Amino acid sequence: MALPIVAIIGRPNVGKSTLVNRLAKDRQAIVHDQPGITRDRTYRPAFWCDRDFQVVDTGGLVFDDDTEFLPLIREQAMAALTEASAAIFVVDGQLGPTAGDREISDWLRRQKVPVLLAVNKCESPEMGLIQAAEFWELGLGEPYPISGIHGSGTGELLDQLITYLPSPDELPDREEINVSIIGRPNVGKSSLLNAFLGEQRAIVSPISGTTRDAIDTVVERGDNTYRLIDTAGIRRKKNVNYGAEFFSINRAFKAIRRADVVLLVIDAIDGVTDQDIKLADRIIDEGRAAIIVVNKWDAVEKDSYTIYDYKQKVMDRLYFMEWADIIFVSAMSGKRVENIFELVDVAVEEHRRRVNTSVVNEVLEEAVKWHSPPTTKQGKQGRIYYGTQVSSQPPTIALFVNDPKRFNDNYRRYIERQFREQIGFPGTPIRLLWRGKKTRDVEPSLNRATKV
């Protein structure tokens, strides 16, 4: 469902992200005692009474300073307003009206979006009314005293807010496919997001660490709705300092868990690095479908064999993800970017796919016929009784055997390859659970391939 959008606007460090966390009933927006933590516009689902909507956290607005990312942050805030049904202008009740507040309120009065004035940091109900009264001078109507930390006063604010939102009957009902964009810093994740959208939703800069939050953006292609999640670049743990970057990386890992499909973005110039391999490991650990996106392909000198050779190099390093499709794109030019959606659709379908028990056992019967289970040094042979798919997302097949310990890694890889060859499952990992027939104990194994 395409939910109505509410933009959260205000100066740096007035508590916008704290209010977003309060409204969204989570702590996904990064809150840190440092101005400028939020840079891109980030989307969070929220609700009040019987109304669902999205709150959009934006960077702190400063009109009289063009250093660093501030002009780009202004663009993001303006873009958020253009798609919003309403806006909440957050000010600091402890400081009182500032020149920056007056400048933003003058700008907001020229917009065609209804604006509610939230006076934050009013921790005392009695003092809050006095603090809020000072903000009548901004000319934006009634100031609502609130506490983003404790939640006081937000009920009255939200009661008024939902009067500006479209009714649920006016909203299309569609299932969303969650797609997380993951990669090292500066491989082009935000550029890829912007290429999907045809606009600059995420701030793009040659400086590593530009993206801080996991940015949610909803787009539609054909009959499908996709929630694209851009994330902070993930560096080696020893290079990460505690603070905003630490929280950003945690958000990125959570974004992998939220995803139906993960786009693992690799820099075509650098190739597959050790950090890329660790990210691929994380994707498999979480059981997510995945597509390997080789970005900056326009910067590579090519001949008729380049793609084949490069693909082989990628697979040599990411051999345990041989099931994932690889696509070569240029986010800057947009070349082949739209083709990613076709691969996403296939990966999602396979990730959710269920196979009849009869089909599973036909594959097992044929596999055992061609290659019998191994025999131990004591002369005891492994035996597979039957198999059945027990879950999806990722597809998980339980194999009931006489003794899981009698099946070595080579044979387990062989059985997985047979399922891949006979059934498919492109774009998604599969898990095989080897269960003893008597004990029915599940051996904790992801059945990950190892290089032979």
From Swiss-Prot:
This is GTPase Der. GTP 2 binds at residues 183-190, 230-234, 295-298. It comes from the Bacteria. Residues 4-169, 177-352 form the EngA-type G domain. GTP 1 binds at residues 10-17, 57-61, 120-123. NCBIfam families: GTPase_EngA, small_GTP. GTPase that plays an essential role in the late steps of ribosome biogenesis. One of its GO terms (molecular function) is GTP binding. Residues 353-438 form the KH-like domain. Associates with the 50S ribosomal subunit. It comes from Crocosphaera subtropica (strain ATCC 51142 / BH68). Belongs to the TRAFAC class TrmE-Era-EngA-EngB-Septin-like GTPase superfamily. EngA (Der) GTPase family. One of its GO terms (biological process) is ribosome biogenesis. Pfam families: KH_dom-like, MMR_HSR1. HAMAP family: GTPase_Der. Keywords: GTP-binding, Nucleotide-binding, Repeat, Ribosome biogenesis.
